[in-house]
Regions:
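Short, conserved beta-turn/loop elements at beta-strand boundaries and strand-helix junctions
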Residues: 63-68, 114
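Conserved hydrophobic positions within beta-strands
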Residues: 58-61, 97
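Residues immediately within or flanking Cys/His clusters that coordinate Zn2+
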Residues: 21-24, 38
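A broadly conserved sequence feature marking short terminus-proximal activation segments
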Residues: 1-22, 115-120, 126
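Short, basic/aromatic beta-hairpin or loop at an interaction surface
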Residues: 76-92
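Well-ordered alpha/beta subsegment
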Residues: 90-126
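Short, cysteine/histidine-rich loop/knuckle motifs that typically chelate Zn2+
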Residues: 26-29, 40-46
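Short functional micro-motifs and their immediate structural scaffolds
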Residues: 35, 46-50
Length: 126
């Protein structure tokens, strides 16, 4: 899998993953949390959100099983599952899930270190 394009807006997310932490944004005004990263709160419009580490555990909201690779680099990994996961600390993340996956399953984060970046994956909670 190829490395993501990391810019100044997404760097705190990727830095958190490199440290094996899931980081969401939290509004300084309404205190709601969200992902993906945005420059202002999607709920009240306030700017300058805080970065907040969360456990990363959550519940599968939806998922899809890919039987065709999105790129040649992933051709030997099909089939694989990508899920929308509602995080316990707030926010929703899209990530690969290893093993069994079903709507409503509790999942826990796993961090896969590559040469220059860290990938967030999930597996079913024991």
């Amino acid at each position: 899998m190829g490395a993501p394009a990391i810019d100044r807006d997404s760097a705190p997310w990727w830095d958190g993953l490199r440290a094996h932490r899931v980081v969401v944004q939290e509004c300084r005004v309404c205190t709601r949390r969200w992902l993906p990263r945005t420059p202002a709160c999607p709920y009240c419009g306030a700017g300058t959100p805080n970065d907040q580490p969360v456990s990363g555990t959550g519940v599968v909201y939806s998922f899809v099983r890919a039987h065709r690779a999105m790129s040649d680099a992933m051709a030997d990994e099909v089939p694989y599952t990508i899920a929308a996961i509602d995080l316990d600390g707030g926010g929703r993340v899209f990530a690969r899930v290893e093993g069994d996956c079903a709507i409503g399953h509790r999942v826990a984060p796993e961090f896969v270190d590559h040469d220059t970046w860290t990938e967030l994956r999930y597996s079913e909670c024991p």
